C-alpha cells in the first residue's frame, strides 16, 4: 500500500509538472558507427561543445562503459565527461561521489545526461533509494526541466518511464503472472512522463509478451518498445524514430479482457510499427511516415485498388521470436488473409513452472484504420504498419508438445 501511495504521488507530480526536456530512449546494443543516434544526441544537447554527463551507474564495468560512451559522444562534437557514480566501480566512495556538491553542480550545468546499459536496478537504487530522489537525481531533473536531454540505452532506457521492469525473467514468466514488486518490476525515473510505458531490446527479444501484461497491471494505455541500435526521440508529445530499425507502439485504449478466464487475456489492442524516420504524436495519434516512405508505396487494405503482395499464409509457432511480431504485422498488412496467428509457449517447461501447459495464441487481424507503407529505398524491405488489431487468448498446450511417430 505504501508503494502504491508513493507511486500515486510520483504520477501526480509528473502529470502536473511541465517538463521541457527531450528523452532519447535507445533500445540497447547501440553500435559505435550509428551516426544517426550519436549525432542526434549531440544535436539535441545544443551541438558542438555541448557538455554531457555520462552515468555508467548500471554497468558491470563502469569505467570501460563510460569511456566508450564519452569517446563516441566526443567524436560527434560533444564535451562529454564520466560521472563516477556506479556501485560496481572500483576505488571510489560511492556515497561521497553521489553527494559531492562539485559533481552535482557539474551535472546541473550539463546540457545532457546519458545513462549506460547494464542492470537498471542499480540506477534507481543509487539515484532514487526507497523512492526518494537524491540531490544528484534532482540535478539531472534540473537539466531536463531546463530543456536539456536525458538519453539512455538498454538499462538506461528502462528507467525512462514511471514504472519499469527491474530484473524480469523471460516473457512467458510475465505472461503467466509470475512477477513481484521490487523483484521483477519497480518504479522508474519517469522522464517520458506518466502516461507512456517504454521497454528496450524489444523486437529482438520478443518483449511484446511482457509489455502487454505490464501495461494492464500498471494502468498504461500507451507503450513504446524500442528495437536495438535504434532510438525514440521523445519531445513532449512528439516521438521520432532514428537509427537502424524501428519501435512498436502499443495502444490499449480500446482493449478489453475477460475476467472469467483464469489467465492473462486481451482483446482489441492496437499495434503500430514505426520505422526509422517515422514520427508520431502521442496526443493526436497521428503518424507521419518518413519522407522516403511517402514517396513510395502506400498500402490500404480498405482501398478498392488494394493488391496484397505477400502470398504465404504463415502460422508463427514462436510469435515472441526475434522480430517475429513485426513480420506477422507486415504479413497482415500486405497479405490476403484477414488474420495472422501465432503461439507463445514453452516447449520445455521449467521445473518451477506452476502452469507448464499454459500458452497464449496471438491473433492479429484487419480492422478499421489498418494502413501502412512499404519502401526499398534504404536497401531493405521496410514497412510502416499502423493499427493492426491484436487479441491474446490463453490456451492449453500438450505436454510434451509432440511425440515421435511409432512404426507400423
What are these regions (language model features)?
Residues 20-48, 59, 63-67, 73-78, ...:
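C-terminal and late-domain segments of enzyme folds
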Residues 114-117, 139-165:
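Catalytic nucleophile loop
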Residues 7-17:
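Bacterial N-terminal signal peptides
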Residues 120-133:
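Glycine/threonine-rich flexible loop motifs
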Residues 24-25, 51-56, 81-84, 112-116, ...:
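Structural recognition of the beta-strand scaffold that forms the well-ordered cores
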Residues 1-6:
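Positively charged n-region of N-terminal signal peptides that target proteins for export
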Residues 102-106, 132-147:
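Catalytic-core regions built around general acid/base machinery
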Residues 62-123:
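Substrate-binding cleft of extracellular glycoside hydrolase catalytic domains
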Amino acid at each position: 500500500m505504501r508503494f502504491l501511495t508513493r507511486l500515486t504521488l510520483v504520477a501526480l507530480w509528473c502529470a502536473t509538472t511541465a517538463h521541457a526536456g527531450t528523452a532519447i530512449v535507445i533500445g540497447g546494443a547501440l553500435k559505435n558507427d550509428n551516426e544517426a543516434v550519436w549525432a542526434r544526441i549531440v544535436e539535441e544537447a545544443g551541438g558542438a561543445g555541448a557538455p554531457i554527463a555520462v552515468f555508467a551507474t548500471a554497468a558491470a564495468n563502469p569505467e570501460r562503459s563510460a569511456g566508450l560512451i564519452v569517446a563516441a559522444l566526443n567524436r560527434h562534437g560533444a564535451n562529454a565527461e564520466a560521472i563516477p557514480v556506479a556501485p560496481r566501480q572500483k576505488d571510489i566512495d560511492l556515497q561521497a561521489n553521489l553527494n559531492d556538491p562539485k559533481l552535482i553542480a557539474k551535472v546541473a550545468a550539463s546540457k545532457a545526461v546519458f545513462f549506460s546499459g547494464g542492470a537498471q536496478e542499480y540506477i534507481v537504487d543509487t539515484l532514487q533509494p526507497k523512492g526518494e530522489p537524491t540531490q544528484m537525481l534532482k540535478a539531472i531533473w534540473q537539466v531536463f526541466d531546463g530543456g536539456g536531454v536525458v538519453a539512455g540505452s538498454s538499462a538506461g532506457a528502462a528507467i525512462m518511464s514511471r514504472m519499469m521492469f527491474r530484473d524480469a525473467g523471460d516473457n512467458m514468466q510475465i505472461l503467466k503472472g509470475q512477477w513481484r514488486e521490487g523483484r521483477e518490476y519497480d518504479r522508474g525515473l519517469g522522464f517520458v512522463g506518466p502516461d507512456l510505458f517504454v521497454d528496450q531490446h524489444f523486437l529482438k527479444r520478443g518483449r511484446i509478451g511482457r509489455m502487454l501484461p505490464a501495461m494492464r497491471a500498471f494502468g498504461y494505455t500507451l507503450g513504446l518498445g524500442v528495437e536495438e541500435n535504434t532510438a525514440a526521440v521523445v519531445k513532449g508529445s512528439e516521438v521520432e524514430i532514428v537509427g537502424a530499425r524501428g519501435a512498436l507502439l502499443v495502444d490499449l485504449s480500446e482493449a478489453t479482457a475477460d475476467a472469467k478466464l483464469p489467465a492473462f487475456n486481451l482483446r482489441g489492442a492496437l499495434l503500430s510499427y514505426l520505422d526509422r524516420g517515422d514520427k508520431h504524436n502521442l496526443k493526436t495519434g497521428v503518424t507521419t511516415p518518413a519522407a522516403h516512405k511517402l514517396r513510395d508505396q502506400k498500402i490500404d487494405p480498405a482501398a478498392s485498388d488494394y493488391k496484397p503482395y505477400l502470398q504465404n499464409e504463415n502460422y508463427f509457432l514462436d510469435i515472441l521470436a526475434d522480430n517475429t511480431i513485426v513480420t506477422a504485422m507486415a504479413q497482415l498488412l500486405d497479405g490476403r488473409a484477414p488474420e495472422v496467428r501465432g503461439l507463445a509457449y514453452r516447449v520445455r517447461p521449467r521445473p518451477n513452472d506452476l502452469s507448464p501447459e499454459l500458452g497464449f495464441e496471438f491473433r492479429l487481424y484487419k480492422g478499421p484504420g489498418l494502413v501502412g507503407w512499404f519502401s526499398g529505398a534504404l536497401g531493405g524491405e521496410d514497412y510502416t504498419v499502423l493499427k493492426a488489431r491484436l487479441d491474446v487468448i490463453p490456451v492449453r498446450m500438450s505436454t510434451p508438445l509432440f511425440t515421435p511417430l511409432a512404426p507400423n
